[in-house]
Amino acid sequence: DSNSGNIQWEQEVGELSSGVAAGFGIIVVADVQGNMISLNQDNGSVLWTVNLKGEVLSPPAIDAKFIIVKTGSGELLALDKSNGEILWSYRSKLPALTIRGSSSPVIEGDNVYVTFDNGRLGVFELDSGFPIWDGAISYVRGASELENLIDSDSDPVVEAGVVYTTNYQGNLTLFDIAQKRAIWQSEASSFYSPLLIKGLIILVESKSNLRSFFTKTLEESWTSDEYLNRQLSNPISFSGYTLVGDYEGYIHVIDPLNGKTIGRKKISKKPIKKIISRSKNFYAVDESFNLYSLSI
């Protein structure tokens, strides 16, 4: 229960490899054996299980008819929501070396937007899986395999005809959907999706420094090294503020207009790994999978 934290039901499904996705009456998880498991959202009963022959490291996207999954090997799959049947698939080209992790697909209208470990954005027809267009978030620039890691492990953000993307050792890149091409980029390195708030793009980089850009002019607004090397979590928007967690179990509240910290609270002795915003409350998960419900 989101208000009390009381457990409404439990279901034993084995060791999981991905986070939880929920929507349209179902909950979907993946286990370490490559099984995708669909559960009834009301009572937790197992609706179906299908083996995808590949590890799934990120939550899938759920539509009224489809479940879109990306495997750790770079394969994109569409499953029938009612029975788990594989309806179409697409396999991306993987680089020789990748970071362990994966982005989730995003369904917007009749299209699927997904970023890959080769540093590219792909756009597909939801019904057929037909590739509509793709583009590079960044290109390799180094001489070694480590320098050439350009994985995009962050979900694309689709807003007002623009797709906002990031990757590791690459760029913050904006794509125009109508033009089907990149229209702007700034060198950056991030594991997280950019946050759009109050006319700004806020980015948590891989070393936990923060950067901000105006959405209209794309000029840099402010930068902050206050949290450098504090292993920040993903940023969220809540009550008009930007929130992040860190490796010491703190939640920090930041003014998105100037980057100034206006509050913080220690909620755990473990690193905060994920925070999620939901109406009146926001939720944080620490490294030991403790769940916290908080408000400002």
Please tell me what each predicted stretch does.
Residues 37, 77, 122, 173, ...:
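WD40 beta-propeller blade core
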Residues 24, 31-32, 71-72, 116-117, ...:
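Structural signature of WD-repeat beta-propellers
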Residues 7-24, 46-63, 86-109, 133-160, ...:
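Extracytoplasmic beta-rich repeat domains
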Residues 217, 241, 246-290, 296:
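C-terminal closing repeat unit and adjoining cap/tail of repeat-based domains
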Residues 116, 127-128, 136-137, 155, ...:
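Pro/Ala/Gly-rich low-complexity, hydrophilic intrinsically disordered segments
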Residues 1-4, 40-44, 80-84, 125-129, ...:
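Short loop/turn segments that connect beta-strands within beta-propeller blades
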Residues 197-215, 219-253:
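Loop/turn-rich, solvent-exposed surfaces of beta-rich toroidal or solenoidal domains
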